């Protein structure tokens, strides 16, 4: 055939119309007419497939077919083809030589070529005669015409099965078609045509292997394709078919023609399995896909071109010339595509193709194929005679042919439209780039190169309107219900353009349009094409859709029309009816657009996708717009069309117009079908296929038709019976329908909106708003969409909207029950579940009514207000999905669906396969029975629990008992689950499973061993198990795959707590999923209940203090595993807090318990030896705690809000701020605070009552504020302050913090607002921290200085008067940290209060921040962000800390310990750490905080910097991410001022009474740390790093060393001191400070170091802050203090150079620089001073701490670490290390003494320490670090001596000024310019006065640390400590610099670097030695 066809082509130009031509040419003709014949022949020979595309526009269509065939050929017959191509080429050349003029006379030539090709394929020769005889006078159009048919009748033909489309049956079929459709008698076409048809249909039977491209295309359904491919069959019919097909895509016929003309190709096709049309089509397509096609074009192009040229020349000479003109341009255009591959070949192709095209054009012209296509094949029928030859090509009318000439090749067009290649590798004809995989193609089509090539293509073919043509195709397809004809008509031009369409076909069958058009050309092809197209389009439609999304709207446009046409062929009536229904529903236009865009968007329903336009790319984006539309109703395509490019719009319009015409026609039918049409919206983002939709609704009845509008994510479904629609609507009321796991919304098109609303309302009613409905947000990223149960609650949709849960204020944080706010938006009740439980709680508390931001209607769900509706939003979509399902189920249960709920039961499906099944498949098991409510798939146990209506369950059991179902080879066992089974209670199900495995398991005590892990990937169970095994044996586990959740049962509660703490501090990512971890919510249920009480509110502060718990609770809440009841019962925060609290002090009073929760330190202290004092404090603390906890509850809400904000970031920030706003009463509260202060001082009970009242007020205010999310960020701070004042210390802290906060708070709030605006709290915080730090630093410093100066006496008095109160405040500040978070904003309050608040706040804030960070971040922020945030916090904390540390190391120690403990607590380590750490931490915190009120300045500086970071984080977290931003901002402000003012000395002074407790607490804390080491350490580190990266890191380093020293001793006892490296250091520092306070020397050293840290951090490396005398002391003590300062200051450089990284350096540029300067100093001096080394140790420990959390963990885990720290301290003689070591060990003893002589400690501490340090510095450093008070005292003395030495060394510089004379004033005067330093200086001056009065105690350092705040107030007289001045001391180089610049220059000097390196080396060496000694000693 090929040869004959080819010859006939050569002969055919004139003869083609003749029977021989049809026979020989017919195959070519149908494919490309004469040209196509040549092409087909060349396809085989030269892979003419590509060439045919190039040959002519019609050939482009032809190419479509041939391409496909060729593609297959390429695959199957690549070698044979090559051979044949060669033969064909030679033959063609020969033929060309012979009959150039008579290309249409190819018949003869064909015989010649056949001879040549016969060698390759003998059949060709045989068929060629047949072809000749068959095609002699008739082309496809002529054949059709002979039957009185037109191209449009091809559609009818396509309806015949391929099997029937045999040459024998074809005439009968054609006649039948004629009789039925045309009413004409089908002329008896010669059997030749039938034979030809047979050949076409039976590629094997005839050389026209695949007219059967239809089969190749895989459209067995399309008899048209067969016919098309059987152009030989009735010439008229074939011609018509070809015309239509050519119009459609000319490729299908072309392949046949090509194959025919290229007889060997046909043979090859057959040989290559192309004989079977169906197989050939598909295989051909696949083979041909892109590159092969290109290859064919290239290889076959030239050879084919030459023969074709000759033939074409003759043809051109013939009437075909006109046709060729029309067709040639397309062929040429097509050629360019190919020609890009082979320009020469393309040209050749074009030349020969022109003649061929001419012949085909002649046919087309005569037939008016285009007209025929559009109007029907009447014209083609007419024209086939004169143009019969061309009629093969003429499928394109002359105009079409002309267009073709001007059009690119089909391959080029396919590439232009980004049609998915059918075969890979695909060679982009535009770019000559080979894409081996679809992925590569998708990437390539989005490259600038390809886009530019597309641009050039359009320029190259100005006559080609890629958009218009596709639209025309669409129009043609759509206008004429007989899409085949129309398709062929409109597509033929389009195809000419769309030769690309053939390309597309080749590339991706998904472009149904192209494929379909080829079918259209030949009815058989069309039909088959359609059927296969459908199957393929369905399978590939995603690709198509993807392609459009990829930015290949072209593909969509071209494809959608084809799809539509195919679809029309398949069910044009149905489709019309559907479309009509759509239009009638008012969505007609939109629907048309949808159709067009549909093709562009996704090939859900191939036929449905009209070609939006060649520029379908725009349509890709319209999907997003349409998403919103679909959200509203999914009806209007206007948004999409708007979004679409104008071209696309124009195409869409055109298409829609034609579609409208179709629809109009269909409207009549529509009326019949209208009631049976459904609109499905919110389809999956990744698209769905028609088959998916059918599969979903098949259970309800027969699905007549499906129309998918991908760009709108909508589909129209026509059911056979209206009853099915009713059943569906009823069904969806109770059970959401899901496609690919995403719930879709379903409504009746006409009533779409109304129904959606009704349905969703019904759903809401039925589910009482518990069902979260899907909300389509254009910004899916902004919120998690929770789909109401009505619309399947799908995780995918959960992304779009976040269900907000309003916490009712009355519930307070304790009632964290998440209330589902359901709003009905566009028929969608959307429940936004705050990702973070805190916000949920807040919102839930806020309003019983569920408010949906996106919802048009807020649905009040009073019952739901407390519904936990497990609308626990997971951080991830999975969580959201789970939450959605849980929420829906829960809501359903909680809501009036009680009937349903009562009727609901749980089905157990067991024996599921290990893999290979989807949630949908499990859903499908129950879906047909209706009443499906929820599902829980336990993939780990191969079980699934399905919550379903009882009746349905019974039916289900009966059915599956009778008809067992297999899934992946496993026979499922379906039975009823126990009656009491609650599918939402994942833990209960887990326990059931545990019982099955271990009947003896103790269920009562098992909950505390559960660890809930959410957001797991599908294959993440093993990873999680591996993680769990690191913390202990995993006894049992369950993986809930559909909720992406796992529950592990570890061997002990400690392991669970450790794992939880670790994962909280170190969120783990598995792939793209960040794990969220939580403990069993049931552990905290009691506390949650308590939380409901005012006491519980206290607990909620505690929870805040341990945000980890909140996180856990929230995670629990977020994770479906948390039951709504659990959520209701326990507020998320309180759950975790309680767990920790219960573990720590379950026996404490509720008030105390609350206090403990808020301040575990308080409880611990009580538990500790200081229990009496603590008890005294506890009343105060309790009262304070009550107020604080009430406030904290608010704060907790804020914290929750903060967390929510973290997850929701800015949005929620406003709400969190609202809680603060609720705190707005804080103005009055301030007065109250003062009153509270008095009350607390006077009567703890009164204070408690008062605070409690305030707290309640605050809670109410918070509730109100929550309502007004951003009402007042500042006021919330005030409220916090108000709560804080409840405790004198807390009040002072609050006031201080408020004062600082007010300035900072204003900025912070503003920034917070800004941050709220921003979505990433971390980023905002970071930026804000820096900006605010810089801005607020001066203000904060000034405020802090003033406040500190004021507070110092007041705080000292307060703490002295209420030492326990101080502790209580310390505890309270934990609550307060929440409150202080608020208080931070309200800096206006008295600074002492602020300081106290800040001190406690740091913990609470750290906790909250950490918890929030961890919580929120795990949920909303990527782990990197969390880490970054944590780093930021650490940096902030570090900066603050270094400042504090510099201000006073002791202060740093005491302050940092609380801070760190707060950090640890805040970091979710707090509670766990608090539990273990509570003893120490609580003790410290109490001591610390009691001191902190006094020492608040330094703590405020340091803690405030940290806590501001943390407290402000809390404050700002409640506000929103701003909390953190503000934290960062405030950190800069607070870091310096707070650290300097709230000096650790002050804290220590206040803490001294509790220091005795602290030692036990330390041990306890270490134990706790051991218990919660990882989480706490990690949290602490992360938090510390992130929260107070600047101050904390430096401070943490120093303090950490101290704490580590302390906790090393304790760590020896408690291996888990590790967890709280920072805390440990903090505790140690606190202990040291307390010891120092008791023993002035120790405290002074710590203070000096702390102040140095504070100063260096706060002020530009206020290492000089140490008074010169102190520096001298430090120097005397081997610069121990200086070393501390140096180490701290140096820590940054050391960290940088060594592993020691100063958060300060890292955190803040300014502070970092100052710290570096200080460090430079220190480092320069350190080598000289062992103290410096000690500092380095501290630094290293700190860096380890901060970075690794390892030092603490190591110290905890390894007593070696403690020993190392001690040894390091001893060896290094760092003041910090020594002090820390001494104070750590000595703190235990000294702290008792210090606790007794808290007021005396500053002088004693420093003086004693100095002496001891000098005397027994190194020896005692070791012994002190290991032994205790004596060593500590000695160390303090040594440190003092060293500090003095250092100071002396530094004395010449500013430091001397500051230090000795306590040149605080000088320092202040000297560096007043520095906001922080100046402020610190002024405070230091005050403090210096105090210190001067207490010179013994090394007030210098105390002053430095207290100069920040408390020290002045606490021990104003005794604080001889260095005034935070601008001087800097380099401990490493033992040099003092008056200015930061000088220090910076020094630090940059080579000498300093060398000294630092030496120092680091020495430090490392000493550390190693110490470690070795410790190990040996151990």
Swiss-Prot record:
Pfam families noted in UniProt: RRM_1, zf-C2H2_jaz
Bias (Basic residues) ranges: 486-543
InterPro entries (UniProt xref): Matrin/U1-C_Znf_C2H2, Matrin/U1-like-C_Znf_C2H2, Nucleotide-bd_a/b_plait_sf, RBD_domain_sf, RRM_dom, ZNF638_RRM1/2, Znf_C2H2_jaz, Znf_C2H2_sf
Zinc finger (Matrin-type): 1928-1958
UniProt keyword DNA-binding present: yes
Segments of skewed composition (Polar residues): 610-633, 1113-1122, 1132-1142, 1378-1392, 1408-1417, 1444-1465, 1507-1525
Compartments where found: Nucleus speckle
DNA-binding region: 1353-1477
Region (Disordered): 1-48, 465-638, 835-861, 1094-1148, 1294-1340, 1354-1532, 1793-1823, 1867-1916, 1946-1978
Positions bearing Phosphoserine: 128, 289, 299, 369, 383, 420, 552, 605, 614, 636, 1100, 1401, 1641, 1667, 1882
Annotated CDD domains: RRM1_2_NP220 (cd12716)
Biased composition (Basic and acidic residues): 470-485, 570-582, 590-604, 840-856, 1294-1322, 1329-1340, 1479-1506, 1793-1806, 1888-1906, 1954-1978
Asymmetric dimethylarginine, modified sites: 47, 49, 54
Chain ranges of the RRM domain: 676-751, 905-979
Main localization category: nucleus
Region entry Involved in localization to nuclear speckles, spans: 472-571
UniProt-listed GO biological process terms: regulation of RNA splicing; RNA splicing
Function: Transcription factor that binds to cytidine clusters in double-stranded DNA. Plays a key role in the silencing of unintegrated retroviral DNA: some part of the retroviral DNA formed immediately after infection remains unintegrated in the host genome and is transcriptionally repressed. Mediates transcriptional repression of unintegrated viral DNA by specifically binding to the cytidine clusters of retroviral DNA and mediating the recruitment of chromatin silencers, such as the HUSH complex, SETDB1 and the histone deacetylases HDAC1 and HDAC4.
Domain notes: The matrin-type zinc finger domain is required for localization to nuclear speckles.
Name of the protein: Zinc finger protein 638
Source species of the chain: Homo sapiens (Human)
